[in-house]
Swiss-Prot record:
Glycans are attached at residues 284, 447, 460. This is Alkaline protease 2. The lineage of its organism: Eukaryota, Fungi, Dikarya, Ascomycota, Pezizomycotina. Residues 43-136 form the Inhibitor I9 domain. Belongs to the peptidase S8 family. It comes from Aspergillus fumigatus (strain ATCC MYA-4609 / CBS 101355 / FGSC A1100 / Af293) (Neosartorya fumigata).
Length: 495
């Protein structure tokens, strides 16, 4: 199997290195793995301790490549001794990453003996076995029903009069960059109006194109002219999944790093006066797999660096806390709702789910032509509603270079605000440990302060109060009537 190789039992010839691995390390670093993820054979993510700086990280990279090369030489010698039959060489260092200094490390394809040496290195916090991730779409339902935008702009359940009416501020998304960390984007689609561009392709030897459609669909919901929440946002394709819709955790981490660095450069350029009108960045990650400490740390680090993040809760009808990045603390984790205001049958739930958004039968942009559309379902479709909402609200702030710039709307504050103004109690089939919150965009207002000041809204609270009042009145009248009847019976009996 090319690239995925079985482990060798040969001893490792350790090469000279610029660092010493000895007793100053307090025990070997742990190797983490997920019980509910498909591991990529012989592939690992190595995370450094907090004290590691750029210089020591570079020295470590050189060291690990030295011992990796020595191992490959031993493999080649063994192949010759066996007349060409033996294990193939390992691929070595793949990606290095540094996400705003909060998560530093690297990934690669290594022999187990190399990993044992790495475990003993004093700079290593932990090692995680690389695993597969995949899109969060549910492909079993395909019906055309573009209702999601209307739902997030109305408080009450959609009716015939509100079914296709999306209320929004026309400037929504302007000055905001949205990173779609997914399968790519059909950047030439007419619905993007030239606002979509290719950012980065992470998988090795892959093309700069969306061969799957999933990333394009999510991008349309974020910022499409017709299908998008934030219709003027800029889109950047960060391809971490191949056309099959699957990829590796290590590639996703590398994609997050690229998006964070791109965002931080924009922030610096805006403050230096090199660009005008930039207001901030958001990211959507409609993918997931088993629990991964590294992936959650990467997303959390991205949020800490100022990148507003939405992630899908997952489609297993299970506790979102058992999946990554859904279980990460800092992003907004999104479950899926239906047109009938139910929790979608596939949507994950639990305390790690922050909010719900439309995710069943969502119409959006697709691949194959500049005009292609498709209707698919999943928490993958719910998450970009929130990513679009993040871009929408960020755009209602003054730009970073503006004389009217106010205190920064941090990801932590915006997450809190979106949860605070959500429609409460609108959904059915919500477990008791899950927030019953449905996303709301402010109903077309362009005044962020007023939107937040309006607070949350409990569906049909007044109707419920009136109903309870009528019941109380009926009970009172019935009691009085029964009392009168009893008195008449009593009087008749006495007479």
């Amino acid at each position: 199997m090319k690239g995925y190789l079985s482990l060798s039992i040969l001893p490792l010839l350790v090469a000279a290195s610029p660092v010493v691995v000895d007793s100053i390390h307090n025990g070997a670093a742990p190797i983490l793995s997920s019980m509910n993820a498909k591991e990529v054979p012989d592939s690992y993510i190595v995370v450094f301790k907090k004290h590691v700086n750029a210089e020591s990280a570079a020295a470590h990279h050189s060291w690990v490549q030295d011992i990796h090369s020595a191992q490959n030489e031993r493999v080649e010698l063994r192949k010759r001794s066996l007349f060409g039959f033996g294990e193939e060489a390992y691929l070595g260092l793949k990606n290095t990453f540094d996400i705003a200094g909060s998560l530093v490390g690297y990934s690669g394809h290594f022999h187990e003996d190399v990993i044992e040496q790495v475990r003993k290195h004093p700079d290593v916090e932990y090692i995680e076995k690389d695993s597969e991730v995949h899109t969060m779409e549910d492909p079993t339902v395909e019906k055309s029903a573009p209702w999601g935008l209307a739902r997030i702009s109305h408080r009450d359940s959609l009716s015939f009069g509100t079914f296709n009416k999306y209320l929004y501020a026309s400037e929504g998304g302007e000055g905001v960059d949205a990173y779609t960390i997914d399968t790519g984007i059909n950047v030439d689609h007419v619905d993007f109006e030239g606002r979509a561009q290719w950012g980065k392709t992470i998988p090795t030897d892959d093309e700069d194109a969306d061969g799957n459609g999933h990333g394009t669909h999510c991008s349309g919901t974020i910022a499409g002219r017709k299908y998008g929440v934030a219709k003027k946002a800029n889109l950047y394709a960060v391809k971490v999944l191949r056309s099959s819709g699957s990829g590796t955790m290590s590639d996703v981490v590398a994609g997050v790093e690229w998006a964070v660095k791109s965002h931080l450069k924009k922030v610096k350029d805006a403050k230096d006066g090199k660009i005008k009108g930039f207001k901030g960045s958001v990211a959507n990650m409609s993918l997931g797999g088993g629990k991964s400490r590294t992936l959650e740390a990467a997303v959390n680090a991205g949020v800490e660096a100022g990148l507003h993040f939405a992630v899908a809760a997952g489609n297993d009808n299970a506790d979102a806390c058992n999946y990554s990045p859904a279980a990460a603390e800092n992003p907004i984790t999104v479950g899926a709702s239906t047109l009938q205001d139910e929790r979608a049958y596939f949507s994950n739930y639990g305390k790690c789910t922050d909010i719900f958004a439309p995710g069943l039968n969502i119409l959006s942009t697709w691949i194959g032509s500049k005009h292609a559309v498709n209707t698919i379902s999943g928490t993958s479709m719910a998450s970009p509603h929130i990513a679009g909402l993040l871009a929408y609200f960020v755009s209602l702030q003054p730009s970073k270079d503006s004389a009217f710039a106010v205190d920064e709307l941090t990801p932590k504050k915006l997450k809190k605000d979106i949860i605070a103004i959500a429609t409460q109690g609108a959904l059915t089939d919500i477990p008791s440990d899950t927030p019953n919150l449905l996303a709301w965009n402010g109903g077309g207002s362009s005044n962020y302060t007023d939107i937040i000041a309006s607070g949350g809204y409990k569906v049909n609270a007044s109707v419920k109060d009136r109903f309870e009042g009528l019941v109380h009145k009926a009970e009172k009248l019935l009691t009085e009537e029964l009392g009168a009847i009893y008195s008449e019976i009593h009087d008749a009996a006495v007479a």
